[in-house]
Amino acid sequence: MSRINKNVVLALLTLTSSAFLLFQLYYYKHYLSARNGPGSSKSKGNRVGFDSTQWRAVKKFIMLTSSQNVPVFLIDPWILESINKNFEQVKNASQGPASECRFFCVPRDFTAFALQYHLWKNEDGWFRIAENMGFQCLKTESKDPRLDGIDSLSGTEIPLHYVCKLTTHAIHLVVFHERSGNYLWHGHLRLKGHMDRKFVPFRKLQFGRYPGAFDRPELQQVTVDGLDMLIPKDPGRFLEEVPHSRFIECRYKEARAFLQQYIDDNTVDAMVFRKRAKELLQLAAKTLKDLGVPFWLSSGTCLGWYRQCGIIPYSKDVDLGIFIQDYKPDIILAFQEAGLPLKHKFGKVEDSLELSFQGKNDVKLDIFFFYEEADHLWNGGTQARTGKKFKYLFPKFTLCWTEFVDIKVHVPCETVDYIEANYGKTWKIPIKTWDWKSSPPNVQPNGIWPISEWDEVIQLY
């Protein structure tokens, strides 16, 4: 009996001692946390996460670019999104040493930065120094699309992307080039035949799958994870642009062939119309941008851009498309204040809305609103004299950026499908006689407006 009691007592003492030891460890841990802050490590003075491969690669890249006065800025979507969500914390961290690596130490393959090429003064020297610092770098180039319209310069090549690897982490440096519409453009990252396709997992890159266009961002300096760097002043605005940045060029080669086959109209009247149409489009683009209303080139204006990289001189108007969900009631007032009075308003927001504004010297701005169905999109038309309604069907499309008459504007990415819906397979042949009620292959009758609604749906000014 006494032996059993001794065993019980021994077990109880062991259990009590273990519990007390665990309590001491728990207390010690929380005492240190309270004393040194929530981001402290077990060894006083160490910083959590700063030994990661990712952070060391970014630090070395920042040291490299700073020493060479290369004004790079962070564009990595994942990190910018994290910064944007914790912006106050990042601003506060800029005032003192970082105790924990919260952004650049997260495991990933790449970190993306960008620079504006016209600010880069020593590209070749930078490349050599990067390799001396231990980076393995790959550079991609391509012909400068800004010179495609100039035969003698069309072969000039410009840098598009650098991918610099340090051990297992890579820095993707996207080279932005200025375009005449006062925006920034980057090219497609296309590997040439001799390049190592296993250099990094290229498919995981967040930029370079296609060319992209961005508004020129205002930048600010911050300290992130102990590293000083530039980021967009409005990270949220930049992040909104990323998934919608795809850019397609005007087809200069095909346009030259078209203008050789169909001699361009260079009469005084044609040149005056092009000038006025360009001014009208620039004014419309500014007005809609100020309203935050996205639009795209539609109908004859879209055809002119795609077929001949210019304005069709016999079209006599400028055509734009807007998704009906982007309609804002103050559109009419905004155009009137911009000096474009309303010429007519057909339809209503719920059905077949169309607005037309009078520009200078009889150049008209037509805005067609597009409605979405299960498998197609459509815009409406109204005959003022009879009240007849028409519907123009289009396959669904997405929007890409392009440059047209020195403006960054949207066009349907699926441009050929869009144009063929409106003009048929023979869109390459100029047609000067056009009946909007019967010529388009995608038009169909859509009923008639009740006379009781005419005052609302047929407004002429």
Curated annotation (Swiss-Prot):
**Which GO terms fall under biological process for this protein?**
basement membrane organization; brain development; cerebellar cortex development; cerebral cortex development; negative regulation of cell population proliferation; negative regulation of JNK cascade; neuron migration; protein glycosylation
A Pfam family? FKTN_N
Subcellular location, in the record's words?
Golgi apparatus membrane; Cytoplasm; Nucleus; Endoplasmic reticulum
The cellular component terms of Gene Ontology attached to this UniProt record, alphabetical and capped at eight, are: cis-Golgi network; endoplasmic reticulum; Golgi apparatus; Golgi membrane; nucleus
Lumenal side stretches = 29-461
Q: Which reaction does it catalyse?
A: 3-O-[beta-D-GalNAc-(1->3)-beta-D-GlcNAc-(1->4)-(O-6-P-alpha-D-Man)]-Thr-[protein] + CDP-L-ribitol = 3-O-[Rib-ol-P-3-beta-D-GalNAc-(1->3)-beta-D-GlcNAc-(1->4)-(O-6-P-alpha-D-Man)]-Thr-[protein] + CMP + H(+)
Instruction: Report TM segments.
Output: 8-28
- Show the segment(s) annotated as Required and sufficient for interaction with POMGNT1: 6-27
Which ranges does the record list as Cytoplasmic topological domains?
Answer: 1-7
Q: Which UniProt keywords apply?
A: Cytoplasm, Endoplasmic reticulum, Glycoprotein, Golgi apparatus, Membrane, Nucleus, Signal-anchor, Transferase, Transmembrane, Transmembrane helix
- Identify its membrane topology class: Single-pass type II membrane protein
**What tissue specificity does the UniProt entry give?**
Expressed in the retina, with highest levels found in the inner segments of photoreceptors and the outer plexiform layer (at protein level). Expressed at lower levels in the inner and outer nuclear layers, the inner plexiform layers, and the ganglion cell layers of the retina (at protein level). Expressed in the heart, brain, spleen, lung, liver, skeletal muscle, kidney and testis.
What role does this protein play? Catalyzes the transfer of CDP-ribitol to the distal N-acetylgalactosamine of the phosphorylated O-mannosyl trisaccharide (N-acetylgalactosamine-beta-3-N-acetylglucosamine-beta-4-(phosphate-6-)mannose), a carbohydrate structure present in alpha-dystroglycan (DAG1). This constitutes the first step in the formation of the ribitol 5-phosphate tandem repeat which links the phosphorylated O-mannosyl trisaccharide to the ligand binding moiety composed of repeats of 3-xylosyl-alpha-1,3-glucuronic acid-beta-1. Required for normal location of POMGNT1 in Golgi membranes, and for normal POMGNT1 activity.
Name of this protein: Ribitol-5-phosphate transferase FKTN
Q: Which organism is it from?
A: Mus musculus
